[in-house]
């Protein structure tokens, strides 16, 4: 790459298309060659003495990128030869700074040259091109990337107003900001782009100390600049301590300096800077440091302290001791070699260093000793390997394997195995052999869960009372043994003469027996089912993209976000408790082993006095001159100070301790301690952590119930379904209650179901041509209901001429859309209408078949189709393909054949498909009262406290019941099916207007009640409002209006209202007890068992049920049961999972819909007050959401200290349950203090503890 250019030619600066100057191709330095350098490489420059090189980039690996300016061989032609390439800076010197009067670098080079006795013959008057000439020469050179921007200083001009940019590091003002290359970071971090380190297969690459790759300490040295500062810091510190005559500080500083030089040596090895110049300089550097260390130790040991003090205080260097001058001379040579090494390597100060210290890879270690399902779920969603992809690439590069794309990165040995035939990204065989032998043969899998026996449990323990009972039962078994051990320790403390090695061995054996009995508790803690919290975290992710069938509005997102923030600290404490459990058990075992030792300090020499990471390179900003020595023992002293007052002083130990100190001038600060004291303390901690585990399991169970309870009360069944998705046992439906329904509540009576067995027996006696063809493909349940069957069998049973199963027919017509499309269903019916006769029938048998089977089946088909169009047709069932069936022609054919009901069928078909008036025909008529209520929309609002309190609670509850029952009556079975099916079976359902209006009204009522309280500034009025709404809720219960009652309870237990401590104190206890009884009725424990019992006892009384229970039942039944039955033995030898429809699932859905429809039949006989109803309806609009209400709550009662609230509530029962557990299990105030010491980020190495 060269060209000839005119030496004197002047050009204008490079401009872009808009005419603006671009500061590209600007050299950052100009150097002159001082030594000859020849190379055959095309991308490197060959240098001769006197050549001028314009430096464009200073590489971090010791190679610079520059443009060489050389005179042409033809002297008659005033021209230059330009070449661009890499060159070693050690063969050049900088001349640009000398011309600008900055001699620092030149002076240092002169020192180097004088020390090496070099004689240079350089040009005395080098000619440097101007920027314009340089740009003119380089205009035609093609560069692969834009070069780094160099700041152009702005000279001070008076009276000039312009925008300037200041760079603090360079101390320069500029008019423009830098043009950063797009791959600037990669250029700094990528060592493979320079000649010294080539990215060749088999060439090992260093693993960079990237924050994205490792869990780094805040003070870790990451950049070359940090390492340079660190070494200089310890060099200065060592020299200062030597001259200050401080022996201990000097030894400490010298020790740390030696460690840093070791890291520098490791750095050069990792960067493959192994040329002779580097090796010789490193060897001289280490040799000089060792001489300095030996001479300094001789100086401190051979010279008395006073003499050293006098010599060190001399300011005149010539009057110092020859030995000290020799030591300082050796240290100055060490200085020189260190700077020389730096100039030889000439690194980029922003270069990221290789990883020099052991650190954990990110996403491969979760810093705890237990299973972390949150980390495992995160990894499974974001990567196909069970090891982080960046970790695999880094380890592969360090092993000499280069993967051009992610598909070539091998998975770890714990990944799922697949055959070579099915693998789409299978590496070559040599690569596979090399991978197994080099990288991952010793790399473990992700440590997101511990490799223990109990971590292999297949089914997790559910968060329920049964699991809590297991933990409590196991703890009670351990308590008896533990109390006996504590008793033995107390007896020993009371009489030390009873010391016996046999007794200690026995206690050691009991300890192991006790710990082995803890395994069931560890099993439960390790395998708790936290699926609901995992789903909550995923749903609360702001960047999550939901599927089309998941309907989550802004209100739901706010609820999920609020729930996640309120529960996160509980989960964090739970995992901290598990780590604390681990620490206590380990300490318990160690202390028990300690009992068997005759000398408790026998292992003390094995203990490292230095804290972890003492010799690791740390940023100098974390050190100062005062704590350089204290860093050595700071961690240990801190731990001793934390526990120095935990044991009672032992007089005998103190006397012996002081006597030994008086006899010895040197001691290690270790104190004597009583083994029984330590063992008793470990027993107490072990006893407390067992209580703590029960408490946290209980908290997780209660918080799960509270979360589901709130979602159920707000009728957010979609949120409930998403939260419980994937949980063990999710969706289990207990059909016992449905089967036990009273006959009074039964809507679809079926008197024939009792005779099903006799009827099936009678079918066997019929001739073969009259028997049903698909009867063998029907599956019957124990309650004489169809449990499942094939599509043909279900259609055949639906149109059976002898058996009319009314419940089956209604269930089929309501839920058919989950089995067939509309076109498919009607096609099956038409095919059933046109039955083909069996083969080999004689004339008499054929006539009997037509008379006894064909004609009755045709009548049944017409009857079913008429009933379907008349009572169960929904506009969303319409499909384009229905026109191909010619239903009107089918009805006309049935009329010609004189089939009963065919005329009515034709009428329904014409009404549904020709007149296009389907919605008006099926929509219920609105009552006159509803129309009047909608016409008079604008009315008085309950906008003030006085207006609300002025309404009698009985009147308010009465009119609220009338209004909500009318809305409830608008709910249809199609609204319910659409709510749970969404777009699962069809996308033409549309919204659920009736059900959505009912849910919206209940939620608006909740917001209205809570807002009415928080907007009132006066405490006494707020208390009156609380009592007023509690009385309204009680009357709603008397009127069987459980929907409004639940809405009021939810408002009073919402976070903005519940935290009003002073307001709740003003409510009389009797009123709070009343609220407690209402809340207990709606307790979600055992699937709202109290509420369901209350609802079942109503018989024929009018009622507005709480619809959240129905939504939960519908959701769990639909999502928790499969659409198809899986049989162990297929019928007729056929094993087809999708062949047998799970009709029992559809029957359960209809059972729930049956109860919903039942409560629509009986109406209230209350007198309607249109004014009150109108005011209630209008007051529910435009209410601020819960977040705004919470802000108002903080304003009226800021910073609550202690929650004094109603006696019980569902949203905050965890606190009351926690208080109950503390009463039952004893006070555990001290365990929380101990637990706080074992936070993950505060865990420290414990030193031996003694008594004073």
UniProtKB/Swiss-Prot annotation:
Asked whether the keyword Cell division is assigned, the reply is yes
Q: Which GO terms describe its molecular function?
A: guanyl-nucleotide exchange factor activity
GO cellular component assignments = plasma membrane
Stored Gene3D superfamilies: Ras guanine-nucleotide exchange factors catalytic domain, SH3 Domains, Son of sevenless (SoS) protein Chain: S domain 1
Quick one: where's region Disordered? 409-454, 623-648, 1201-1252
Q: List, for all copies, the residue spans of the domain called Ras-GEF.
A: 952-1199
Keyword check for Nucleotide-binding, yes or no: no
Biased segments, Low complexity type? 416-428
Looking up CDD domains in the UniProt record yields: RasGEF, REM, SH3_Sdc25
**Which Pfam families has this protein been placed in?**
RasGEF, RasGEF_N
Biological process (GO) annotations held by this record are: cell division; Ras protein signal transduction
Q: Which PROSITE patterns match?
A: RASGEF, RASGEF_CAT, RASGEF_NTER, SH3
Instruction: Name the UniProt key words of this record, in alphabetical order.
Output: Cell cycle, Cell division, Guanine-nucleotide releasing factor, SH3 domain
Bias-annotated ranges (Basic and acidic residues)? 1214-1236
> Which InterPro entries does this one have?
Ras-like_GEF, Ras-like_Gua-exchang_fac_N, Ras_G-nucl-exch_fac_CS, Ras_GEF_dom_sf, RASGEF_cat_dom, RASGEF_cat_dom_sf, SH3-like_dom_sf, SH3_domain
- Where composition is biased (Basic residues), the residues are 1239-1252
Q: Where is the SH3 domain?
A: 26-97
Domain of life the protein comes from: Eukaryota
| Residue ranges annotated for the N-terminal Ras-GEF domain, each copy included | 782-914
Q: What else is known?
A: Suppresses the CDC25-5 mutation in yeast (restores cAMP level) and has similar functions as CDC25.
UniProt cross-references to PANTHER family, sorted A to Z: CELL DIVISION CONTROL PROTEIN 25 (PTHR23113:SF368), GUANINE NUCLEOTIDE EXCHANGE FACTOR (PTHR23113)
Q: What job does the chain carry out?
A: Promotes the exchange of Ras-bound GDP by GTP.
Supply the name of the protein: Guanine nucleotide exchange factor SDC25
**Species of the source:** Saccharomyces cerevisiae (strain Lalvin EC1118 / Prise de mousse) (Baker's yeast)
């Amino acid at each position: 790459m060269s060209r000839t250019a005119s030496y004197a030619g002047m050009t204008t600066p490079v401009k872009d298309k808009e005419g603006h100057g671009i500061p590209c191709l600007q050299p950052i330095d100009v150097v002159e060659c001082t030594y000859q350098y020849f190379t055959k490489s095309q991308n490197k420059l060959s240098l001769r003495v006197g050549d001028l090189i314009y430096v464009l980039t200073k590489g971090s690996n010791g190679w610079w990128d520059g443009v060489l300016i050389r005179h042409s061989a033809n002297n008659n032609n005033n021209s230059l030869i330009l070449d661009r390439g890499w060159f070693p800076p050690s063969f050049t010197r900088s001349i640009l700074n000398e011309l600008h009067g900055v001699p620092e670098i030149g002076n240092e080079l002169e020192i180097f040259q004088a020390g090496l006795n070099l004689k240079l013959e350089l040009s005395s008057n080098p000619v440097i091109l101007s920027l314009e000439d340089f740009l003119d020469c380089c205009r035609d050179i093609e560069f692969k990337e834009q070069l780094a921007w160099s700041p152009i200083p702005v000279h001070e001009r008076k009276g000039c107003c312009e925008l300037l940019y200041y760079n603090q590091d360079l101390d320069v003002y500029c008019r423009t900001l830098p043009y950063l290359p797009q791959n600037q970071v990669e250029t700094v971090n990528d060592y493979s782009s320079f000649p010294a380190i080539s990215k060749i297969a088999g060439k090992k690459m260093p693993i960079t100390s990237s924050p994205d790759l490792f869990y780094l300490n805040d003070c870790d040295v990451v950049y070359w600049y940090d390492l340079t500062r660190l070494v200089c810091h310890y060099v200065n510190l060592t020299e200062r301590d030597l001259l200050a005559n401080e022996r201990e500080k000097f030894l400490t500083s010298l020790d740390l300096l030696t460690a840093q030089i070791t890291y520098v040596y490791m750095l050069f090895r990792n960067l493959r800077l192994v040329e002779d110049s580097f090796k010789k300089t490193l060897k001289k550097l280490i040799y000089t440091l060792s001489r300095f260390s030996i001479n300094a130790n001789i100086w401190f040991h051979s010279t008395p302290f006073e003499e050293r003090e006098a010599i060190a205080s001399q300011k005149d260097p010539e009057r110092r001791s020859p030995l000290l001058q020799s030591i300082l001379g050796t240290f100055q040579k060490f200085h020189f070699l260190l700077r020389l090494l730096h100039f030889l390597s000439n690194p980029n100060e922003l270069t990221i260093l290789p990883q020099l210290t052991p650190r954990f890879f990110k996403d491969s270690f979760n810093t705890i000793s237990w299973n972390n399902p949150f980390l495992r779920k995160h990894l499974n969603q974001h990567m196909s390997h069970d090891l982080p992809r960046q970790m695999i690439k880094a380890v592969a590069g360090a092993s000499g394997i280069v993967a051009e794309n992610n598909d070539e990165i091998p998975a770890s040995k714990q990944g799922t195995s697949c055959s070579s035939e099915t693998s789409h990204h299978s590496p070559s065989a040599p690569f596979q052999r090399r991978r197994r032998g080099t990288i991952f043969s010793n790399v473990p899998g992700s440590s997101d869960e511990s490799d223990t026996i109990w971590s292999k449990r297949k089914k997790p323990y559910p968060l329920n009372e049964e699991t809590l009972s297991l933990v409590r039962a196991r703890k009670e078994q351990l308590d008896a043994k533990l109390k006996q051990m504590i008793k033995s320790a107390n007896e020993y403390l009371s009489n030390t003469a009873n010391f016996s090695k046999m007794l200690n061995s026995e206690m050691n054996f009991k300890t192991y027996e006790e710990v082995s009995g803890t395994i069931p508790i560890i099993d439960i803690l390790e395998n708790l089912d936290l699926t609901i919290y995992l789903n909550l975290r995923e749903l609360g992710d702001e960047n999550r993209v939901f599927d089309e069938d998941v309907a989550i509005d802004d209100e739901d997102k706010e609820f999920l976000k609020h729930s996640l923030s309120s529960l996160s600290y509980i989960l964090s404490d739970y995992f901290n408790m598990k780590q604390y459990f681990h620490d206590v058990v380990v300490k318990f075992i160690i202390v028990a082993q300690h009992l068997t030792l005759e000398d408790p300090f026998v292992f003390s020499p094995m203990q490292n006095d230095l804290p972890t990471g003492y010799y690791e390179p740390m940023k100098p900003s974390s050190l100062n001159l005062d704590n350089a020595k204290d860093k050595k023992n700071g961690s240990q002293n801190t731990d001793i100070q934390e526990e120095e007052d935990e044991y009672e002083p032992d007089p005998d130990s103190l006397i012996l301790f002081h006597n030994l100190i008086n006899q010895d001038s040197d001691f290690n600060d270790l104190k004597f301690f009583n083994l029984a004291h330590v063992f008793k303390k470990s027993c107490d901690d072990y006893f407390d952590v067992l209580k703590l585990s029960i408490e946290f399991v209980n908290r997780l169970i209660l918080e799960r119930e509270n979360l589901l309870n709130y979602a159920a009360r707000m009728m957010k069944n979609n949120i409930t379904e998403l939260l419980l998705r994937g949980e063990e046992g999710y969706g289990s439906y207990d059909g016992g209650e449905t089967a036990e329904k009273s006959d009074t509540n039964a809507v679809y009576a079926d008197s024939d179901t009792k005779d099903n067995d006799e009827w099936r027996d009678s079918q066997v006696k019929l001739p073969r041509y009259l028997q049903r063809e698909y009867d063998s493909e029907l599956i019957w349940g124990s309650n004489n209901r169809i449990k499942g069957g094939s599509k043909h069998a279900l259609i055949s049973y639906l149109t059976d001429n002898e058996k009319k199963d009314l419940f089956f027919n209604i269930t089929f017509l309501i839920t058919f859309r989950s089995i067939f499309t509309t076109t498919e269903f009607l096609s099956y019916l038409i095919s059933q209408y046109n039955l083909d006769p069996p083969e080999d029938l004689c004339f008499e048998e054929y006539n009997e078949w037509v008379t006894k089977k064909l004609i009755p089946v045709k009548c049944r088909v017409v009857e079913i189709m008429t009933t379907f169009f008349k009572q169960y047709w929904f506009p969303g069932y319409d499909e384009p393909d229905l026109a191909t069936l010619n239903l009107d022609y089918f009805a006309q054919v049935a009329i010609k054949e004189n089939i009963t009901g065919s005329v009515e069928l034709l009428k329904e078909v014409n009404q549904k498909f020709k007149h296009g008036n389907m919605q008006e025909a099926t929509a219920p008529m609105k009552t006159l009262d509803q129309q009047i209520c909608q016409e008079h929309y604008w009315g008085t609002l309950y906008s003030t406290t006085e207006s609300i309190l002025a309404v009698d609670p009985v009147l308010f509850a009465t009119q609220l019941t009338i209004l909500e029952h009318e809305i409830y009556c608008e709910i249809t079975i199609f609204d319910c099916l659409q709510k749970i099916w969404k777009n699962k079976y069809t996308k033409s359902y549309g919204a659920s207007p009736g059900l959505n209006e009912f849910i919206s009204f209940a939620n608006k009522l909740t917001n209205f009640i809570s807002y009415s309280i928080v907007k009132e500034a006066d405490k006494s009025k707020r208390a009156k409002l609380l009592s007023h709404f509690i009385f309204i809720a009680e009357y709603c219960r008397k009127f069987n209006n459980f929907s409004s009652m639940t809405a009021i309870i939810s408002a009073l237990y919402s976070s903005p209202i519940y935290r009003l401590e002073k307001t709740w104190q003003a409510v009389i206890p009797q009123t709070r007890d009343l609220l407690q009884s209402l809340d207990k009725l709606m307790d979600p424990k055992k699937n709202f068992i109290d509420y369901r019992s209350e609802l079942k006892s109503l018989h024929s009384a009018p009622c507005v049920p709480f619809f959240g229970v129905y939504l939960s039942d519908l959701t769990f039944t639909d999502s928790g049961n499969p659409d198809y039955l899986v049989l162990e033995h297929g019928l007729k030898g056929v094993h087809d999972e999708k062949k047998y429809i799970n009709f029992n699932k559809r029957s359960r859905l209809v059972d729930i819909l049956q109860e919903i429809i039942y409560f629509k039949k009986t109406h209230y006989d209350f007198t309607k007050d249109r004014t009150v109803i109108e005011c209630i309806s209008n007051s529910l609009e435009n209410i601020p959401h819960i977040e705004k209400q919470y802000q108002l709550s903080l304003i009226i009662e800021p910073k609550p200290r202690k929650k004094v609230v109603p006696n019980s509530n569902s949203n905050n029962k965890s606190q009351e349950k926690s208080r109950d557990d503390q009463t039952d299990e004893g006070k555990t105030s001290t365990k929380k203090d101990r637990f706080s010491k074992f936070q993950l980020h505060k865990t420290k190495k414990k030193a031996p503890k003694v008594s004073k």
